[in-house]
Every structure is written in structure tokens, then in C-alpha cells.
């Protein structure tokens, strides 16, 4: 029986990837469709992707597929043929190719079956995920963004919004997508007659969010086709002015793609303009935060002096300290509350409703 999962250590796989000289293409895609046998589909796709040397993260569920991967450039056409043939619903599925790509975005293939391809927390049998808002192409986005009767709503997490967003976009301040959905409904309760434009990184979250808004009585709901990635690609191809400012956060080793030259965020340690995310080098913390080169050198890649000092302890002592902490600390290493407490960042003066 073939092995349908990875058995090599992350360290060895990462070293192999960094030693590669062949160019790779980073690409993401998603599709909502009914998948009757997710396990069999997963195993077949895994076998195909392994043969093609695909790395990345892929989730499949009864509601479809969500993938962020890197493909050897010389096998990209083979990859497309295999993907398009894997299920009728995936024939000619839209592929979002990365803008800034050194080919080092992933080093292992992880293909998992999940309950949902995006965790939404929706538990309502009357909700119809197929009833979605209208797609907007890049030129339509630019036409609508200055309309006073149109609201652009960012359906990403706080750390994504912080480094880049559409001009005048509304942030739904939360740590997770499942928290955002009811929050967005509450925040926009008095704007049901306006045009509501949802957007996210590649389209998967804002597509479901558009269906959720329609389900909750909003009338004129839109979402950016292909998300920020596709918008930026099309805007540049067509010579359109970019209405997205800053960097697009991505969930791989790159942690971001520059869309415009604007740097709208600041180092969480010294306050200098900076939009480079990193994880604290202390594995017992692993906090996601923004750090400039000066502070990276000063704190040795750590988020604080406490973590910097802990990192210098013997390995056994570090392991002992990690074991004594709550198991959830790594799970919630992107929490805004944890970030504010660790970095001593004050909470915004205005509430979400006031904003």
C-alpha cells in the first residue's frame, strides 16, 4: 500500500527545499462544491501531487477544497492537467499565482480532510452557501471604491489588515473568521441598503461572507473576484491605479506580498514604519508580530527581553518552561489581545461601532 502522508522531519524537508535550485511557482486556489467522498478524493490528489513534487497546504471537505501550494515551474502544466481532471467541479478552476515569489514558500505537502475548508462557525441549516454576492473585477472595484453609497469590508484578521488594505476599508477587528461573520452583521446593521463589498486574500472567506450577509438580510452584496491577489494582478496587467495600499499578508514562509510601495504599519517594538511580520524566535512564545531590522538585531528575533533571555537558557530548561505553560499559547499566537499584552500596545481609543 502506498504511503499517503509525509514521514520525513520538517527540518530535513526545509533544508532540502532551501537547497533546491529549480524554480517554483506559488499558487493558491479554492472551490466550493459538493464532495461526496472527501477521503478518497484526498488520497487520489495526494498521490498526484507527490509525483509532481508539489509542496503546500491543502484542505478538502464536503464543501470543497482550499489550497496554497508551490509547484515546480517545469511541471506546472502537468499540475494543471492533473488538478483540472481530479473532479468535474475543478475543471478550469481559477489559479491565483503569487506576485512576489522566490519559490521558497513551502517545503512539505500537507493534504488534510476537514469539516469545513474555512472555519466559519455557521450552524444554521437554512444557510445557503451557494447564494453568494456579485463578483467584482478589478476595474469594477476601482469604480465602486469611491462611491459614498458603497462600503468595503475587510474579511481578514487584524494582523492582515494592519499591513495592507483597500482605501477606506472597514476593519472587522477579530482574531478569527468565525468571530468576524456575526460582527460584520452587527457593525453594518444600519447600512443594509448600501452596497457592501467584501474582500479577503484570495476570495474564499469573502465569498462565504457575502452569502452570510445575504442570509442576514443585506440586499446589495458584492465580493472581489479572486481576492486581493487577483485584483492586484489584473490591475497591474490593465494599467489600473492600485486602490489597495501596503502589503498583502500571505500564510506561508513569505508572510507577505508587496502590492504598493506604501508602508502603513509600524514596528511593534520601536514604532518605526515597518510591515515585516515575523514569529518570536522563542519557541515557547512564537508570537506573530512586526519587527524592524534594528529591533530584530537588538532582540535577536525575539518579541521581548524576557523571551530573549529565555532563549539563552539550556534546552532542557526551555522545554521545562514550555511544558509548564498553557497548551493553547501556540494556537493563539496571532491573538490581538496577546499581542497587545506582550508588546504593551494600547487598545484603540474608538470602539468598532464608532469606527
Swiss-Prot record:
UniProt catalytic activity: uridine(34) in tRNA + AH2 + O2 = 5-hydroxyuridine(34) in tRNA + A + H2O
Positions of the catalytic residues: 200 (cysteine persulfide intermediate)
Top-level taxon in the UniProt lineage: Bacteria
PROSITE patterns: RHODANESE_3
Similarity comment: Belongs to the TrhO family.
NCBIfam families associated with the record: PRK00142.1-1 (NF001133)
Name of protein: tRNA uridine(34) hydroxylase
Organism: Yersinia pestis
